[in-house]
Amino acid sequence: MVSQLRNHIIQISLGLGILGVSGSAATLCVNPSGTGGCSATIGVAVTAAAPNNTVTVAKGTYHEDVVITKPLSLLGAGSQNTVIDATGLSNGVNIDGHNHPGLSHVSVSGFTVQNANFEGILLTDSSFITIDNNHVTGNNKSLSFPGGVPTCPGLPSYFVTFQGLDCGEGIHLSGVDHSTVANNLVENNAGGILVSDDTGSSHDNLISANTVQNNPFDCGITIASHLIMFGPQRPLRGIYHNTIVGNISSANGLTTGEGAGIGLFAAAPGAQNWGNVVVGNTATGNALPGVAMHSHSPLQNLNDNLIAGNQISGNGPDGDPGTTVPTGIDVFADEAAGAAPITGTVITQNIFKGEGIDLAVATSGGITVRFNSFFDYVGIVNLGTGAVDATLNWWKCSGGPSANGCSTVAGLGVRTTPWLTNPF
């Protein structure tokens, strides 16, 4: 299974590297004064553009909700100079495949996108989209807490049920495939980056080299299946084959205590969130664990996910599996509520420091944990009944788990022999 996931990383990287479309294309321009043959607003230029055109935007501040419905490139003059201020508006940028089926090959680069009521940048039901080198900040302004209950007045109905704590986060991909979100700074929104299946399956996307920080109400990066399906699971549905690589996720969810660094969640009955890769990220100082995997309802599939090569430090506890001290990674299936066991999870080559518990497991499905470096007092706690293959790990010292000065193991069913005598 690990080799298949490695092949998946190669395939998605190759596929996402070729996002252009052939054919001649014109360039339209925008500047605040509308001089020199340019439009004064981004929306006018985007509407006038033919498919595959480029719209270049000069430095300045533009009070707009930019809706994109055709293939094009939207290029700002750098995020420090080019601002889409969506104060009082739904979104800063809306790549609207939900109302324009088949939308593909859109790129948005070089903007600050701020102050939207909901998502700063929203992508729905579209393919081969690139969102890169943007600063997405201060969005989700509609989030309110009347009577202490979170709500997002005006959020489209296909999002309302599940977006109570974040109003869609800074960047939201729903029903999106073969797309890239890379090199963005996403901060001070309710939540950071969200990949969901509210409007359709999201798969084969690359979330890479983003800095996601100080989003106070929710996770840094959330991969969440909201699919509701009470019958037998069907293949190629939900959230699958997404790669989360090389991101920094820090200090998220601190206001509510509800934010993991990176979260893989199955929220509703029948939700499917499988075959994803979380590799080479840094998760530090978040309110919940650095990486959290939660399955809560019957008929869910949160299987065959790979968590590899991440740097995990100084994150928070998680009440769902019952950890009360800072926790690095947790894998939790609420089997008492009818959730299916989580199977096929591989956790490998991660480095844990500054946690109370490095890895907490609470599922009967079994898990493979190898080639990790545990540097804290409790390396692994098994809170479930499944077997944990924890061979070939480093336990803080060469003596192995529970030796004097080494990390420890708690719970039954954790196999640790042989172990590494040096850090991986």
Task: Identify the function of each model-found stretch.
Residues T56, V67, S73-L75, V83-D85, ...:
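Extracellular beta-strand solenoid repeats
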Residues V2-S13:
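Bacterial N-terminal signal peptides that target proteins for export
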Residues A26, N53, E64, K70-L72, ...:
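The right-handed parallel beta-helix/beta-solenoid scaffold, focusing on the short coil/turn
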Residues D85-N99, N115-L123, F145-G175, E187-S202, ...:
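Extracellular beta-strand/beta-solenoid scaffold signature
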Residues T324, F371, V381-F424:
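Functionally critical loop-and-helix segments that line ligand-binding/catalytic clefts
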Residues G17-A48, K59, A77, N81, ...:
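Right-handed parallel beta-helix/beta-solenoid
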Residues G43, T47-A50, Y62-L75, V83-I129, ...:
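Extracellular beta-strand-rich solenoid/capping regions of secreted or surface-exposed proteins
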